[in-house]
């Protein structure tokens, strides 16, 4: 199954479960519309640019699905990164009540607490299927609920990216010496590992990566995988794309709402 299809179906199924309280998938063509519901209008800020139709598109599918199965009673308006708040401040926007919901990757916030990484991915950790097993059947969601409760936020699954690549580089990387002093956009604990190898990790939102590479502000960038990376045009300014590095076996995006 294509990753794009899986991510979108995961979002649709999640939406149906959240709103209707029943198991559902994207294959259900005409779900029963719930009646007698209050009108709810939420705003969701995304950490992703609108051009990424897998990540940003999954948020649109969620909103459309909820709108459909509630007869328009539950309406979520989605805003791309930078429109309300910068992409890396999505969680803060929920905490502060600026928006009711966000779609983000929790490892963007390891600067607050490294535990946030376990909601998305850690280097050499679980792949997407193992993450699902842990979160859904292994007590992972309960542990994350307890952790996120400290931030007055509730978080739940929002699709996954699948295996991620090693990043795009302006120069070829052949030895560890080539990594020393390298300014690379990379998120989560992986950035800390790169730092110990001599690189200089940078936290940059997705929509700002291309101009940073083009101007030489950074020397390399890790984002997602070929389909998403091509959308942002990294290959035009950073032609080296090694596949020998496997950092994240299945990064999890997450929906976060205020408690």
PLM features per residue range, with description:
Residues 2-131, 143-259:
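N-terminal secretory/targeting leader peptides
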Residues 138-139:
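Core domains of carbohydrate- and sulfate-ester-processing enzymes
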């Amino acid at each position: 199954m294509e990753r794009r299809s899986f991510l979108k179906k995961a979002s649709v199924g999640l939406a149906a479960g959240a709103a209707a309280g029943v198991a559902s998938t994207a294959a259900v063509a005409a779900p029963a519309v719930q009646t007698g519901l209050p009108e709810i209008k939420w705003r969701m800020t995304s950490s992703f640019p609108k051009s990424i139709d897998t990540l940003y598109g999954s948020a649109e599918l969620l909103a459309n699905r909820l709108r459909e199965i509630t007869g328009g009673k539950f309406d979520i308006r989605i805003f791309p990164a930078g429109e309300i708040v910068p992409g890396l401040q999505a969680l803060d926007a929920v905490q502060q009540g600026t928006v009711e919901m966000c779609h983000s990757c929790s490892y963007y916030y390891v600067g607050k607490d490294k535990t946030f990484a376990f909601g998305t991915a850690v280097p050499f950790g679980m792949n997407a299927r193992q993450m699902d097993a842990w979160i859904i059947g292994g007590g992972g969601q309960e542990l994350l609920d307890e952790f996120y409760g400290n931030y007055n936020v509730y978080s739940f699954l929002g699709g996954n990216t699948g295996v991620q690549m090693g990043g795009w580089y302006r120069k070829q990387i052949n030895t560890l010496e080539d990594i020393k002093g390298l300014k690379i956009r990379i998120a989560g604990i992986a950035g800390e590992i790169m730092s110990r190898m001599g690189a200089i990790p940078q936290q940059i939102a997705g929509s700002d990566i291309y101009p940073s590479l083009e101007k030489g502000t950074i020397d390399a960038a890790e984002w997602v995988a070929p389909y998403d990376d091509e959308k942002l045009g990294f290959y035009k300014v950073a032609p080296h794309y090694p596949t020998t590095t496997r950092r994240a076996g299945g990064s999890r995006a997450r929906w976060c709402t205020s408690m």
